[in-house]
C-alpha cells in the first residue's frame, strides 16, 4: 500500500521553510531540538484558547526569537500586554536565554490546516457528529478561497467497537506536485471512547521556488470555449442544425420523385 509522506517535509527547500531556524554542532543539536519540542508543547497547552497555528523558533547570537501565528492575537497579548509579558518570562525560564516574542495574526483561520484540525477535535470532544464537523469545515474552507481540502479522521468514530478511518475531499489536493502550496495539520480528540486522530490537507494554489504565486495562465473561459448557437428563429425553417433527415434535426431533404406504380 502507498503511504502519505509529510507534505511539509516533502517540500522543504523547494517551496516551504523550516519551523526551527538555527545552526548547531553535533553535540548541541539534540538538546536544542528537544528544547524546541518542549517550547511548542508548552505554547500549545498555554495558548489553547488563542487558536495558535504555527510557531517559528529562531536563535540569533545567544538569543531566541519566537513567532506565534494566532487567529486571536488579543487573547495572547492580554490586557495592556500583561499576558505576553508573563509568557515571555516563562519562555526565558524554559530556554535559559533572552526571548523575544512576536505575535502574527492569521487572516483566514478557516483555511489554516492546523486550526481546522484543532476545531474538529474540539467539536468531537463535545460529542458533535464527526461527519457534520468535517463537512462544515470543508464548506467554510472552500468558501473562503481554498482550491481543495481533504480531511481524515481515524479511531472509534461515534463510539463504535471497531476503529475505522473515514475521509472526505472537495476540490483538488495534488500531493505529488512540489510547487503546490499544501498546508498540513494534525490534531487529536480525547473522547470517552478513546483518542481520535484528525489530519487536514488544504490546497491553496501553486507557488514558485521563491514563495510567490505564479501568474495566472491565460485559459479561455467556459463561454468562450463553447460554440454559440444561433437562436431558433434565425435558422432556416426554424429547425435544429444537423444531418438532414435525423430525428428532430430539421426538415428532410426533398426526396427523389417516387417511382410510378407497376414498375
Curated annotation (Swiss-Prot):
Pfam families: KH_2, Ribosomal_S3_C. It comes from the Bacteria. InterPro entries: KH_dom (IPR004087), KH_dom-like_a/b (IPR015946), KH_dom_type_2 (IPR004044), KH_sf_prok-type (IPR009019), Ribosomal_S3_C_sf (IPR036419), Ribosomal_uS3_bac-typ (IPR005704), Ribosomal_uS3_C (IPR001351), Ribosomal_uS3_CS (IPR018280). Residues 39-107 form the KH type-2 domain. GO terms for biological process: translation. The keyword 4Fe-4S does not apply. GO terms for cellular component: cytosolic small ribosomal subunit. PROSITE patterns: KH_TYPE_2 (PS50823), RIBOSOMAL_S3 (PS00548). One of its GO terms (molecular function) is structural constituent of ribosome. Keywords: Ribonucleoprotein, Ribosomal protein, RNA-binding, rRNA-binding. The keyword Ribosomal protein applies. Residues 211-263 are annotated as: Disordered. Residues 219-240 have a biased composition (Basic and acidic residues). Binds the lower part of the 30S subunit head. Binds mRNA in the 70S ribosome, positioning it for translation. Belongs to the universal ribosomal protein uS3 family. Part of the 30S ribosomal subunit. Forms a tight complex with proteins S10 and S14. This is Small ribosomal subunit protein uS3. It comes from Bordetella petrii (strain ATCC BAA-461 / DSM 12804 / CCUG 43448).
Amino acid at each position: 500500500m502507498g503511504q502519505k509522506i509529510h507534505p511539509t517535509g516533502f517540500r522543504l527547500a523547494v517551496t516551504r521553510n523550516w519551523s526551527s531556524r538555527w545552526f548547531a554542532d553535533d553535540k548541541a543539536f539534540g538538546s536544542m531540538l528537544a528544547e524546541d519540542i518542549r517550547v511548542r508543547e508548552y505554547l500549545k497547552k498555554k495558548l489553547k484558547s488563542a487558536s495558535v497555528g504555527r510557531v517559528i523558533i529562531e536563535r540569533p547570537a545567544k538569543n531566541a526569537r519566537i513567532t506565534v501565528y494566532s487567529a486571536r492575537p488579543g487573547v495572547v497579548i492580554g490586557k495592556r500586554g500583561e499576558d505576553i509579558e508573563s509568557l515571555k518570562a516563562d519562555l526565558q525560564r524554559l530556554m535559559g536565554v533572552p526571548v523575544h516574542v512576536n505575535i502574527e495574526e492569521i487572516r483566514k483561520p478557516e483555511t489554516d490546516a492546523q486550526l481546522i484540525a484543532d476545531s474538529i477535535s474540539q467539536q468531537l470532544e463535545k460529542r458533535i457528529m464527526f461527519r457534520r464537523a468535517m463537512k462544515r469545515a470543508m464548506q467554510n474552507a472552500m468558501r473562503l478561497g481554498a482550491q481543495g481540502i481533504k480531511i481524515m479522521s481515524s479511531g472509534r468514530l461515534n463510539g463504535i467497537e471497531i476503529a475505522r478511518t473515514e475521509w472526505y475531499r472537495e476540490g483538488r489536493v495534488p500531493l505529488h506536485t512540489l510547487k503546490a502550496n499544501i498546508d498540513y495539520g494534525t490534531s487529536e480528540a480525547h473522547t470517552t471512547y478513546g483518542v481520535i486522530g484528525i489530519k487536514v490537507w488544504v490546497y491553496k494554489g501553486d507557488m514558485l521556488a521563491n514563495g510567490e504565486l505564479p501568474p495566472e495562465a491565460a485559459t479561455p473561459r467556459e463561454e468562450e470555449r463553447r460554440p454559440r448557437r444561433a437562436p431558433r428563429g434565425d435558422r432556416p425553417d426554424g429547425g435544429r442544425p444537423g444531418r438532414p433527415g435525423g430525428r428532430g434535426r430539421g426538415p428532410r431533404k426533398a426526396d427523389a420523385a417516387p417511382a410510378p406504380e407497376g414498375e
